[in-house]
Structures are given as C-alpha cells and as structure tokens.
Amino acid sequence: MEVLGDIEVEGGDKFTTEKVDACNCPQIIYELERYADQPVAFEKGDRKGIIGVLMQALMDKAFNAPKSKWPSLLGTAIQSLREKHMIMYFTDAKNQEAIEKVNFAGRIHEYDGDYLSINEANFAGAKSNLFVQQKVKQVVKKGKDNSLEKKLIIEYKYPRKMDNCSLERKGGLCLAGIYRDWIRIYVPKGSKITKTEGIELSQTEDLGKTVFESFFELRPEGALKFEIEYTSPVKVDGEYKLLIQKQGGVEGHTYEIEAMGKRHKSFPLDTDKEIIFKL
C-alpha cells in the first residue's frame, strides 16, 4: 500500500497506512480490528471476511498499476520476503527447492557454527505484539574443550496502558491486553541449560535443534527480564560464527552480541544474520 496508495473496497470503506493515534498503528490495522472485534448488538457472521475483500481490491490495484510502479512493487515484495513478512510454499518439489535456496521459505537452517532463533506465539493476548518492545543480548565465552558457555538475556517492555478487554464492554477495541507468550528458543543440538533467572524452561528437541521453551505473561505498563545460561557443543578455533534466524512476521527486535570479549554493534534483526568474530 505504500507503493499503490490508499485502497477502497466495495461499499466505500477506505484503508490507508497513515498512523492512528488510538493505537499508534496504521489505519488499516485499526479498521480491520474495529471490524472484527468491536462489540455490537448483532451477530457479525464472518468477522474476518473483510480480509478477502481487501485482498481482492489490493490485487486489482496492483495488476492495474502503471508500469512506472512495477520496480517499486517488485522491490517491496523482495524486501518483504527477505524480512520474512512474506513466506512462500510450493507443493511442486522443484519450486520449493528453489525458494529454499534463496531463503524465502522460512526454514530453520542447518549451520556449522553457533545458532540462535527465538520464536514466540501470542495466546489470547489481544494485539499486544503491536506494543511490546524486546531486546536480546548474548554473551559468549570459551568453555572446556573449546566448546561454548553462553548467557542469553531477553528483556521485554510494554509501555502502553491496558485497554478494556471485557466481553461486556459497550465499545472500544481490546488491543492492549495481557501479553500471554509461548517462547521457544532454538539453539545447537546438544546444548544444556545450566542456570536461569526470571523464567522456568523445559528442554526438548525439534527440527534438528535443542529447544528451550516456556510460557509467561506480561501486563501493560510492565517489564520483564530473563537470563538463561547454557552450554553449547559447538567448537571454536580461530573464529566464532553465529547464525541468528528471524521469526517470520515480526518486526526486527534489537540484538547485541558479545563473544570472547569482542562486541558487535547492536542492530535490529530485520532478516537472518550471520556474525563472525576472528579470535
């Protein structure tokens, strides 16, 4: 929409990307939430049916766009794929293999160095993800037999006031509710937790990785901080390599990496990122 402009659907409803003060989010998000979740005195039926109508209008506008907009449309699509706001899947094996080679399939990768991927799911927490801020710091030291001793620090801040989310409310939107988060931390297979602070974790395996997982709640205007210490079987000799994979569909959280006394400048994780420290 930033390329094509405002979208108008049948019935005259208009959608834009301009920020709305009520949620500090694009107008299109606010209007879709209002359509789906605002209490009314009648049965709405298919409360998410507007999405199909909107997508049809968006596709019509894209296919009929002047040629001068095609480069911008293509660039926006590629950027969305790189940043995992769009993920592709094909039933045809050759097509699927092709998109996996360019990292457009959202796969958890095999990697010959250290690895980290944090994946989270909001369970009945309204639209808390619009407002929750997250910062990740990882400190790495060389352990016994050139393996790794690691500390992972994850901080959350939720600066917005809580909305009225009662099912009996007369009006208004429930956007800022209690953030109920299931977190899964993917690390190299064989990693083991040695200490935690602020969170209790279970340990399992999935997709060729060891996974630390837990469930927690964060209330509006609140903050949380977790510290997880663990060992990794990855060996280091001459250099330390780390692949951080971004979760699809989320904004780039801030990351800070320190390894063997060397620091990498903090950065937003907008896409998968490989970091290499020469030792």
Where are these regions (language model features)?
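Lumenal/extracellular ectodomains and adaptor appendage modules
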Residues: E2-L279
